[in-house]
Every structure is written in structure tokens, then in C-alpha cells.
């Protein structure tokens, strides 16, 4: 659970924040546990001008928690704010960069004018940066007040918020989708996994949400007859990415040898308790663009040794793996990888960094070792979200590689609104990155929930956006 300091949708990128806020706010579109996009505050939409304009028909008779009416004004206010000065301060704005302006046609119709077509925009509008906020309330109370006293149109309304302690919500009886079954929700921010599990066992917590529970604590929960572990494939994928510019990993044969030299299935079973699935490219099975026919390269240490020999790599060559120091599970995984690499004659050293140092200073500046940990949880579950950031020349997460063919593929799919055509291009991008061996694709980690058996009608969601409208507690 998160130590969020602001409940303003444009201020954060934390998935845990969204598990609370998805109960307070609504977006124009909504994506539930089945990942299908359905109407939210918009009842219908149509693409005009070859995808450069989208017209939304808005739901009528909807009210914000403070009684203010939801209408076209609220939609325009929300996006003017997101794309203006206020949005500049937060991390959400770049997701919506395709939007040029929002035009009010009438009280229940708005047109989104786009700078260029964005095939993922309708999904992004279900995302938490695009939650619709109340104009009058924010103009009267100010942004700082809104941060701590959120108001939306969602099924629950905020009652009280204490930073670092928790937030209390109560059912919003006038929700357009009908009142939720629970009368109250209380979210507690518990930083320590052991404390969260102890509270679950004591019956003071009914549900612990990802990514709180480490694999090592699963047996404790499973051993308690009052509790259960519920898991589902999540959006987070892990890989060891390569320095393709210099050193031994600049050679594609060496990169392929490193992939063949690691037994990913064994790592999943022994270290991750089976709570992950192997991946063939840097995306999970739920990702739009994943090719289910593409299989991960098998563990083959003999073939790996032959490739290293062919590339002229001496036995005992040292390679550095950069990891996030606070990720204890991945530290174990990287130790196992180092042991596997020893088997094929390489000496892997592990260099831990503080997470923000690795992400903001080391990777973007191209100062990593031969390999570096990359965990990515694109909540859109659209491969573009991952692939463009990881492989396009000049992107923050791609300090080493520049491939004009890959750039052209990545750019071409961004302007295509035909889903089937786009999916084919995304699949071909995945195949191309695997042919070039741009990383060791490791695994897609599950979203793990600890649940009291008193909780009924609970459906785990892959993207942490846990809407608790149908849940009951005995």
C-alpha cells in the first residue's frame, strides 16, 4: 500500500494509488477485470477525420460527490488542466500528448482534436491520469485542498485522509452505475509486508493488494484456514537488458549465449514459487502485440558455450549486472543468473543501486554494466507502451541502441487505428527484438493478493485498478 501524498489524478504514476482512486473517480472509458474497454462517463464515441478527432457522447444525469453536475465543461476542464500548467508538475501528461484540444459541442458532446492519431488513446482515457475532476470544486477550494480532499463521480466518496496512515471512503448512493454493496472502505498504508500479513491474520485487514506480498510469505497465508492467496497475471515483466554498444554484449552471438545460458523455468519454480510465467519477448501474455506462438528460447548451456567460443570470448570474462538494491526478490534472481553464467564460463558480478539512481542517472546516461535490470508494468497492456520506450532511438530507456529499421516499425504502428494491422506490426517488432537479442526476457510476475475468506465476489485484476463495487464481507 502506498504512501501517496496527493489524490489528484495528474500527480502520480503509482499503481497502488490507482487501486484506491479507481473507486473515487470515473473516466470517459472504463476497463474492468476482463480488460475489455466499455463506456464510463462517455456512453459512446466515434472516430472522425481519419482518427484525428474523436467525438464522445456523455452520460447524462451524473453528479460529482459534492453535488456538482458532470457535463462537457467538466471534461474540458479536466483535460485543459492535465495538458496545461498544473499537468506539467506531474508524470501523467506525456500519456496524453496526442490531444491538441477538447472542444465542447454541447452539454453532452465533446470533440477531442488530436495532433496525430493515437491508437491507444481510448485505453489511456480509462487510465488514472484521465479521471474526470470537478471544475467548480477545484476552482473554489484550490489544488492543494483537492490533493487531500478528492471528489469524483465514482462509486465511493472520500470521507477522511491521513497522510501515511490511510484513507476512508463511504458508498456514494447516487452513483450512476448503482450504489456499491459495501457501505465503507478503509485503506491502510502499511509499508512492511510482514506487518500487512500479520494484520490480515489478525482479521484487522481483509485484503492485501499487490505488490505488498513477497513470494516468501505466501506459505504463511496459505497455512491459515481463514485466508487465501489469489493471484492473476499482472502487467509487470522483468528482463535483463544489454549494453549493445560496447563490450562483449555488443556482439549478438554473446547476447544469444547469455539468453540460452539461463534456466528461466527453474528460477520461476524455485525463487518465485511458480508465481510468474516465462516470456518470449519483453511483454506478458495479456499484452496487445504478444504472439502466443512465440516461445522463449530453451535453456541450452552447450549451445551457449559454443556461441561464446565462436565470438572469441575468453573463459572467466567478467560481466556486470546492475540491479535495484531494494528489490530483494530480483536480487535473488540475479544471484541465480550469475550462477548459471558461471556454468558457461563467465564471471558475473552484481552491482546494486538505489532504484531512483539506477533509473534516473545510470540507465539513461548509458553508464550501466553489460546487463541491467528492467522491470516494466505498462498498465495499458499495449506493447507500444513498452516497445517504443525501450527500443526507439534516443528514448530515455534506450541509451545504447539505434536501429533505423526498428524505429520505422515503431513509428508506423502509431498512426494505424486498424487494430488487426497494428497487432501484426507489434508482433513483428517483438520478433525483431528477439532476433537481435536486445535483452534476456525473464518473466511476467503475478499480481498477488492476500484475501480473508470473509470477502466474497472478489475478482483479482491484472492492472491493480481494483474496483470494489460488487465485493461483500461476511
Question: What is each model feature region?
Answer:
Residues 57, 93-136, 160:
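Surface-exposed binding/hinge segments that line
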Residues 144, 171-219, 347:
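Ligand-site clamp/hinge motif
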Residues 170-173, 232-257, 261:
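A bilobed periplasmic-binding-protein/Venus flytrap-type ligand-binding module shared by bacterial periplasmic
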Residues 36, 126-180, 184, 302:
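Gly/Pro-rich hinge or "lid" segments in bacterial periplasmic/extracellular proteins
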Residues 156, 277-310, 327-332:
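Structural transition elements
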Residues 1-49, 80, 151-152, 450:
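N-terminal lobe/hinge region of extracytoplasmic solute-binding protein
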Residues 162, 262-289, 329-338, 360-474:
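Detector for C-terminal structural segments
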Residues 43-88, 105, 111-113, 199, ...:
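Aromatic- and charge-enriched surface segment that lines or borders ligand/interaction sites
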Amino acid at each position: 500500500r502506498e504512501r501517496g501524498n496527493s489524490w489528484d489524478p495528474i500527480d502520480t504514476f503509482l499503481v497502488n494509488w490507482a487501486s484506491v482512486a479507481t473507486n473515487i473517480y470515473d473516466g470517459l472509458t472504463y476497463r474492468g477485470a476482463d480488460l475489455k474497454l466499455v463506456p464510463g462517463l462517455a456512453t459512446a464515441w466515434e472516430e472522425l477525420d481519419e482518427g484525428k478527432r474523436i467525438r464522445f457522447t456523455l452520460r447524462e444525469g451524473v453528479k460529482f460527490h459534492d453535488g456538482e453536475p458532470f457535463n462537457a465543461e467538466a471534461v474540458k476542464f479536466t483535460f485543459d488542466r492535465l495538458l496545461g500548467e498544473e499537468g506539467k508538475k506531474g508524470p501523467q501528461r506525456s500519456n496524453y500528448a496526442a490531444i491538441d484540444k477538447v472542444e465542447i459541442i454541447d452539454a453532452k458532446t465533446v470533440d477531442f482534436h488530436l495532433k496525430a492519431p493515437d491508437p491507444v488513446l481510448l485505453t489511456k482515457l480509462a487510465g488514472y491520469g484521465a479521471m474526470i475532476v470537478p471544475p467548480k470544486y477545484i476552482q473554489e477550494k484550490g489544488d492543494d485542498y483537492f490533493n487531500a480532499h478528492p471528489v469524483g463521480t465514482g462509486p465511493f466518496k472520500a470521507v477522511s485522509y491521513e497522510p501515511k496512515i490511510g484513507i476512508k471512503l463511504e458508498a456514494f448512493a447516487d452513483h450512476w452505475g448503482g450504489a456499491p454493496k459495501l457501505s465503507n472502505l478503509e485503506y491502510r498504508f502499511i509499508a512492511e509486508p510482514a506487518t500487512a500479513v500479520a494484520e490480515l491474520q489478525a482479521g484487522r485487514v481483509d485484503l492485501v493488494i499487490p505488490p505488498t506480498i513477497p513470494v516468501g510469505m505466501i506459505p504463511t497465508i496459505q497455512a491459515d484456514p481463514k485466508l487465501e492467496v489469489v493471484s492473476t497475471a499482472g502487467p509487470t515483466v522483468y528482463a535483463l537488458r544489454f549494453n549493445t554498444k560496447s563490450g562483449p554484449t555488443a556482439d549478438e552471438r554473446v547476447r544469444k549465449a547469455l539468453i540460452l545460458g539461463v534456466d528461466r523455468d527453474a528460477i520461476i519454480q524455485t525463487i518465485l514459487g511458480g508465481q510468474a510465467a516465462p516470456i518470449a519477448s519483453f511483454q506478458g501474455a495479456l499484452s496487445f502485440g504478444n504472439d502466443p506462438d512465440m516461445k522463449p528460447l530453451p535453456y541450452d548451456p552447450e549451445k551457449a558455450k559454443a556461441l561464446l567460443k565462436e565470438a572469441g570470448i575468453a573463459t572467466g570474462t567478467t560481466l556486470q549486472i546492475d540491479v535495484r538494491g531494494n528489490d530483494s526478490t530480483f536480487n535473488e534472481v540475479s544471484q541465480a543468473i550469475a550462477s548459471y553464467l558461471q556454468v558457461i564460463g563467465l564471471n558475473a558480478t552484481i552491482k546494486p543501486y538505489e532504484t531512483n539512481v539506477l533509473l534516473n542517472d545510470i540507465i539513461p546516461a548509458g553508464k550501466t554494466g553489460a546487463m541491467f535490470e528492467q522491470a516494466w508494468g505498462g498498465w495499458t497492456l499495449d506493447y507500444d507502451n513498452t516497445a517504443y520506450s525501450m527500443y526507439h532511438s534516443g528514448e530515455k530507456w534506450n541509451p545504447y541502441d539505434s536501429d533505423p529499421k526498428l524505429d520505422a516499425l515503431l513509428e508506423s504502428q502509431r498512426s494505424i487505428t486498424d487494430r488487426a494491422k497494428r497487432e501484426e506490426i507489434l508482433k513483428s517488432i517483438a520478433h525483431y527484438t528477439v532476433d537481435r537479442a536486445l535483452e534476456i526476457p525473464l518473466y511476467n510476475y503475478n499480481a498477488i493478493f492476500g484475501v480473508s475468506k470473509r470477502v466474497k465476489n472478489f475478482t483479482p485484476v491484472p492492472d491493480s485498478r481494483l474496483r470494489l463495487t460488487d465485493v461483500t464481507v461476511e
